[in-house]
A protein has these predicted regions:
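The identity of the second residue at the extreme N-terminus of proteins
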Residues: 1-2, 80
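Beta1-alpha1 glycine-rich phosphate/pyrophosphate-binding loop at the start
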Residues: 3-67, 71, 75
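A conserved beta-strand/loop element that lines the FAD pocket in flavoprotein oxidoreductases
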Residues: 72-84
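Short, hydrophobic/aromatic-rich segments at coil-to-beta transitions
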Residues: 90-95
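Conserved small/polar residues in nucleotide/adenosyl-binding loops
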Residues: 97-99
């Protein structure tokens, strides 16, 4: 599998980075996430306080993460779940384990 840009981690920062890269014109983007769903640690943060700066409203962690998940799903960004990066060689080649 080839990609112009690979983002390791499908939390909000990884998803935001992938979406920003797409806005800058990078066409072939892949997010690799070790968990069974995108969203990262925020899926466990049930308290309010997220999203005020980005979305102009107060959200729980899962709500905030879901906003980014929906943006990724509506974009051309691809993602692989249950996938761990175990090695990077020469800055270009990744060894993956699909769990």
């Amino acid at each position: 599998m080839k990609a112009e840009l690979v983002v390791i981690g499908g939390g909000p920062a990884g998803m935001a980075a992938a979406l920003a890269a797409e806005e800058k014109g990078i066409k072939d983007i892949l997010i690799l996430e070790r968990d069974k769903e995108l969203g990262g640690i925020l899926n466990q943060c049930i308290h309010n306080g997220f999203g005020l700066h980005t979305f102009k409203e107060e959200l729980t962690g899962p709500e905030y993460a879901n906003r980014y998940v929906e943006k990724v799903k509506a974009s051309r960004v691809k993602y692989l779940l249950n996938t761990m990066v175990v090695d990077v060689q020469g800055g270009k080649y990744l060894s993956l384990i699909h769990i």
